[in-house]
Amino acid sequence: RLGADAIRDCDGTEFPQELKDTGAKIYATYYTTRKDNAWAKANPDETQQCYIMTPFYTAADDALTIPLMTGISRELMMVNDHDDITRLWEVIDRTTGEPVPTADWHYDAASESVVIDAPAAYHEYTVSFLAYLIWDPVHMYNSVINDWKDVEHQIPFDVRQPKTHAYTLRRLREYLESHPYVNVVRFTTFFHLFTLVFDELRREKYVDWYGYSASVSPYILEQFEKEVGYKFRPEFIIDQGYYNNQYRVPSKEYKDFQ
């Protein structure tokens, strides 16, 4: 009746039977990396992760404590202190630009803070760390912007990792078989997540619809090192806190990562 070429769903909606029965061409949005919390909860080791940097903290004359999750929504992220933090995290003296040796700092799990035992007085420091994305950033964005109520937080999973990769292929086949009314599958988010960060009040802290910093994991970083032949540094992605947004000139290392 409206003369539409096709009917399409979107995040937060499901096709009602009335639309399926119209005879119109149907486009269906398919979520490769989410909308299956049963799988995500059963395989937390293959949850998507991201690199995040703390604010700058200035040292005085004694030990400096840097809380990791200040200014970050705990609905969105959870610190990954399960994997080797001495290899995957990086503490940087931003005054000199040099990384702080791992022997000179330690992690206090109870307070989720990094403690630098003997920092240089009045130097500024940051911590770059890995965090699990426990709420898909786009799903959170859509939920916040549209003020959705009582919506289960969709957990993103990394389709590049072995178990989830095999499951994803099977899941897609099953989807096609169980949705015969769909004419065109409109994929969204093949494997990498946009870098969308919210604070404790669900306010937008950092939004980049082109970024790759929310698509990392120890598994992927190992693949990176094997392919390029040199050691990965969190700073390749953190980029002094700019996260390699589209206004930055990318480094060789970041282009290698892409």
Language-model segment annotations:
Residues 1-258:
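Glycan-processing catalytic domains of CAZymes
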